[in-house]
């Protein structure tokens, strides 16, 4: 793993990326393990029913950023990252990640859950406006909305992957009687295949920006 990575700086809030995968089988795996999920960012800010389960990272219950666990850099944290026992229980998810998702060095890979009636309080996760965070919608009820701080909203269609600009304030409200399951993938690299896929999506969706080399952040 390199200590730096190409990041795409953009004012766009998100773009859609199309992957060739069966999201329904992955959704079944995410849902089947619900009893194993851990509360995410407990006490950090207002949220209800926000939980996570780690497939790759510092441990099944280590759902937060590596800084929360005493590491000084992503490079040091990466040395201790591994596929967890949860990954062993998710063959369809692993097939997608290892054979279809263009990444050689994974950071955190997590199932994320917002329970029925739950919400994620408004927050932002990056000081720089980056299109980098991959959020794959697996189960997203109709009355569950991603809300931007400026008032815009986004319905994240099941089976669709989104590259999110989490520099901007955002929140999630699940006003339904069904749980919301997503798969979030953090890449520690920017492979040629990723850039090809990403650049094609930007061109199709008229999204502009520029690549910059930064120290790996996640």
Predicted regions and their residues:
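Short, conserved beta-strand element in jelly-roll/cupin
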Residues: 113-115, 128-143
């Amino acid at each position: 793993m390199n200590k730096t990575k190409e990041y795409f700086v953009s004012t766009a809030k998100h773009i859609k990326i199309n992957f060739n995968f069966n999201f329904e089988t992955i959704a079944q795996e995410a849902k089947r393990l619900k009893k194993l999920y851990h509360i995410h960012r407990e006490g950090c800010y207002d949220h209800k029913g926000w939980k996570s389960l780690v497939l790759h990272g510092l441990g099944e219950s280590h759902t937060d950023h590596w800084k929360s666990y005493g590491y000084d850099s992503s490079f040091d944290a990466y040395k201790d990252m591994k596929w967890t026992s949860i990954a062993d229980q998710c063959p369809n998810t692993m097939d997608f990640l290892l054979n279809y998702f263009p990444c050689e060095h994974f950071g955190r890979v997590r199932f994320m859950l917002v329970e029925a009636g739950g919400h994620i309080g408004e927050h932002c996760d990056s000081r720089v406006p980056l299109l980098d965070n991959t959020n794959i919608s697996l189960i997203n009820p109709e009355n569950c909305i991603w809300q931007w701080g400026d008032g815009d909203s986004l319905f994240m269609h099941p089976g669709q992957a989104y590259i999110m600009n989490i520099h901007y304030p955002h929140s999630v409200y699940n006003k339904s009687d069904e749980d919301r399951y997503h798969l979030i993938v953090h890449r520690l690299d920017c492979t040629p295949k990723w850039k090809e896929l990403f650049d094609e999506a930007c061109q199709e969706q008229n999204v502009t920006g520029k690549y910059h080399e930064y120290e790996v952040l996640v």
